[in-house]
């Protein structure tokens, strides 16, 4: 009897710790909002089941910024699957087609780039001109929004081209999504029959090869963990990341984090997103 009582006491002693540990990522988000003097939206979703594991302002609108480029290339791959596009098709363009921040496309004015190369540039280097050239192939912002509606996303909307879509005005619904809608759309593109298995692998690989996300979740990723991501940024107080994460080099969860309406510097925004990512990973490992 004494042994049983001791076991019960030991079990009860662990309960407050478990309850305290559970909201830890949300406590970090609240702290980030306080330090940023802005809003944070976040969702952590199980890739296989679609179950929401953690959420904060998940149904509020946030500017997509360059995170839309993953959805854009998903729409391009859907056209490839349908036989309406080819990743090997070459697109030629002129100097006047280039916009600010085009580190890859500006080097290929003479020879052009294939559709596949443009997707790689748009996702791995966040090349804005590459995104605009691809956007034209799917019918512009209205065409991409129509694609979203077709796959069941009735929230996410693209209204403008690069670079105007990064304006992120307070209260402006243009070029926005919600963390919940973006996560659900990513899951449809990467874990359903919306895209062929080959196209899913290609989209994921472009995200794995992201070369401009170093200061965010990648900076706190434990050894041996998988990450595939795409970031977004605005000069007007916004920042974002969409990512797939998991231990043992496997994609297990979707994480979407958006910031908006903060006066914080870009370095501070990066640091806060990294902190939220670290809290999620720490909680995951318990």
UniProtKB/Swiss-Prot annotation:
Gene3D superfamilies according to UniProt: DD-peptidase/beta-lactamase superfamily
EC numbers on record: 3.5.2.6
Enzyme class: hydrolase
Keywords, comma-separated and alphabetical: Antibiotic resistance, Disulfide bond, Hydrolase, Plasmid, Signal
InterPro entries: Beta-lactam/transpept-like (IPR012338), Beta-lactam_cat (IPR045155), Beta-lactam_class-A (IPR000871), Beta-lactam_class-A_AS (IPR023650)
Span of the signal peptide: 1-21
PROSITE patterns: BETA_LACTAMASE_A
Disulfide bonds: 73-119
Residues annotated as catalytic: 66 (acyl-ester intermediate), 164 (proton acceptor)
Family as reported in the entry's similarity comment: Belongs to the class-A beta-lactamase family.
PANTHER family: BETA-LACTAMASE, BETA-LACTAMASE-TYPE TRANSPEPTIDASE FOLD CONTAINING PROTEIN
Remaining remarks: The class A beta-lactamase family has a specific amino-acid numbering system, sometimes called Ambler or ABL numbering and often misspelt as Amber. A multiple sequence alignment was used to derive a consensus sequence and then the consensus was numbered taking into account insertions and deletions. This allows use of identical numbers, e.g. for active site residues, despite differences in protein length. UniProt always uses natural numbering of residues, hence there appear to be differences in numbering between this entry and some papers.
NCBIfam families reported for this sequence: bla_class_A (NF033103), SHV (NF000285), SHV_LEN_OKP (NF012143)
Protein name (record): Beta-lactamase SHV-46
